[in-house]
C-alpha cells in the first residue's frame, strides 16, 4: 500500500509539475498515473510482479534495477515497513481492524500530499475528497458516530483563522495551507486539534532550524507546512488511539 501511494505522489509530480504536464491532456495524465505499469525510472524496464512484493521485492532485487542496476530508492521499503508498523500499532491500541485499515488508506492519501508539498511546496487539491472520505470513515469506525457540532466548530474556527492569516500575512502562508489545515483539524477533532496544531508547528520550526545554512535567518525560510501537517495529523490519531485504551 505504501509503495502505491508513494508512486502515486511521484507520478503526480512527474505529470503535473514537470514539462510533461503540457504534453498530455487532463484525462491522459490520470490514465497514465493510474494504469501505467511500474517500471524503472532510468531504463524503463517493467518491474516483475514478484519484485512488487512489499519489502521482500526490494530484497529480491538487492536494491537495484535488474536491467540497468541503478539503485532503487530506499524510501520504498522504509515506508512499506512503517505502514505495517502503523497498522500493528493502531490494531493493538484499538482492537479495531476496520479502523486500522481505514487509517492506512487515510494516511496513504496524506502521504501523497506530503510528497508534493515537500518536493514542490504545492498541495494536491484533487486529493481532498479522498482525505475527507477516509478521514470521516476512520472517525466513524473509531467513535461509531459522524462529525458533530464541535467538529464543525473546529473547522469553522480554523477556516476563519487561516483566511485572516493568509490575507494579512501572505508571505508566511500558502493557499494550500489555508485549505488543508482546517480539513486536518476537522479530522483530528476536539480536543486533538490542539495536538495536531502544536506538533505540526513545533516539528516545522525544528526542521527549519536544523536544515538552515550557516548564517541563514529563519524568517522567510520556505517551510513545506503540508508535510508537517501530515505528521501532525498522524500524531493526533495516535493520541486518540492511546487515550481510548
Question: Could you describe each region identified by the protein language model?
Answer:
Residues 1-245:
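A membrane-topology feature that recognizes alpha-helical transmembrane segments
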